[in-house]
A protein has these predicted regions:
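Gly-rich Lys/Arg/Thr-decorated short loops/hinges at beta-loop-alpha junctions or inter-strand turns
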Residues: 1, 9-20, 39-42, 66-69, ...
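Active-site mouth loops of central-metabolism enzymes
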Residues: 1-5, 27, 72-78, 102-110
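Short, acidic/polar
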Residues: 2-8, 81, 117
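Acidic (Asp/Glu)-rich catalytic clusters
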Residues: 9-10, 61-68, 82-93, 124-127, ...
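Glycine-rich, proline-tolerant flexible connector loops at the mouths of alpha/beta enzymes
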Residues: 9-45, 138-145
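Catalytic beta/alpha-barrel core
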Residues: 17-22, 45-53, 70-80, 99, ...
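Alpha-helix-loop-beta-strand connector modules within alpha/beta enzyme cores
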Residues: 26-68, 152-165
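Catalytic alpha/beta core domains of metabolic enzymes, predominantly
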Residues: 90-168
């Protein structure tokens, strides 16, 4: 884990994604262990707490050393995971906001609609816009090359609005 994290940081990563999968059993302990391990070994690197297990995200936040930056909740969307915006807001965390609902947005109009919904939800809960990082959801480049320019346009639209973006 440490070797892989160092490789990512050496390559220019600005945060590390701590993906423990669904981790239904022992997820809370696993996330706590991973957060402590990475924060003890790397200075000033924010960590993205990535799991569908909400209790594991909360456990990671509970041991997070904020002198190394804010924790990042990965992720919320405009459908079944919108409550992760509330979780991030309640814990003064950043949230990766996926610009989708029940499925991938079909075009930038739909992406921007989801972006607006997510931004409004965060701001209603007291979040700064800078604490929402919008992910337009990159599609498989090989299979859907015609959609990639739209994704790049969406990133520019986020930037033009003063919003942060990310992608994975």
């Amino acid at each position: 884990i440490l070797k892989r994290a160092k490789q990512q940081l050496d390559a220019g990563a600005v945060y590390l994604d701590v993906n423990i999968g669904p981790a239904e059993n022992d997820g809370e302990d696993l996330m706590k262990w991973a957060v402590k391990l990475l924060q003890e070994n790397f200075d000033n690197v924010p960590l993205s707490l990535d799991t569908s297990n909400k209790k594991a995200i909360e456990a990671g936040i509970s041991v997070y050393n904020r002198s190394k930056g804010k924790p990042i909740v990965n992720s919320a969307d405009a459908a079944g995971r919108i409550e992760n915006i509330d979780l991030a807001a309640a814990n003064d965390a950043i949230v990766i906001a996926l610009c989708n609902g029940e499925g991938i947005a079909k075009d930038n109009d739909e992406r921007m609609m989801y972006c607006q919904m997510l931004l409004e939800r965060g701001m209603e809960h007291g979040m700064d816009a800078s604490d929402l990082w919008f992910d337009p959801l990159f599609l498989v480049v090989k299979g859907m090359q015609d959609k990639q320019m739209e994704v790049l346009e969406a990133i520019k639209m986020f930037s033009d609005m003063g919003l942060n973006s990310t992608g994975g």
